Amino acid sequence: GNDTFGFLSIETVRKYLRESEKLGVREYYFTGGEPFLNRDMMPILEETLAIGPATVLTNGTVFTPTSIRRLRDISQASSYSLELRVSIDGYNPQTNDPIRGEGTFKQAIRGVRMLVQAGFLPIITIAQTWPEQDGPGIFDSFVETLKAAGYERPRIKILPTLHLGMEEERTRPYSRSERISVEMMENYDSSQLLCSRGRTVTDRGVAVCPLLIEAPDAHLGETLEEASGAFRLSHGACHTCYVYGAI
């Protein structure tokens, strides 16, 4: 997601929810920016959860006791599940805040604590920024941090680094070799790819996937129907998705 895109109003979401029902969509996923800065987010979730399960990817920094209570009420009133994924990139302020911003670690952990107290079991998503050999130790450090915040059996998902946006400057851009070739698709289960079964609604129309909303060629139309066609897998991010599966 990206901060240069605007929030979706409830009217816009409602229009796409109606279209999605006709197309047999079975699951909904909200990302940003930060979805919970959208003042329509709670009613959007209410209307979405009336027709299917929803997942929200949040940085966890803007929750208040009031918004958590509202979330819990919305979740409990629905027959469908509400899943929350909280992005944290380090297990302490020293490792997280240089990536996410000053003070964000403390705010995110506070958000996780409130979610757990309200009965949610958030998935903590972490972009891998460390060498492979450091993985087990870092994973254990995350578990300790989350247990200390009251999350007894934390759900943790390590994500590959996407060399897009700020990450392009922080680490490196994609190399020319990080592309999908025709040969690579032979005998490959393409259902592993995000774009094989979903589309991303933005305030500028419908894009092929959330990773490529900045790419002009990834915007496929104004409706889900228009955007449902095939897409050429020509981007570096497509290669990451190919290697790691839908993220």
Q: What role is predicted for each listed range?
A:
Residues 2-15, 33-76, 84, 88-110, ...:
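Canonical radical SAM enzyme core domain
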Residues 166-247:
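Accessory C-terminal segments flanking Radical SAM cores
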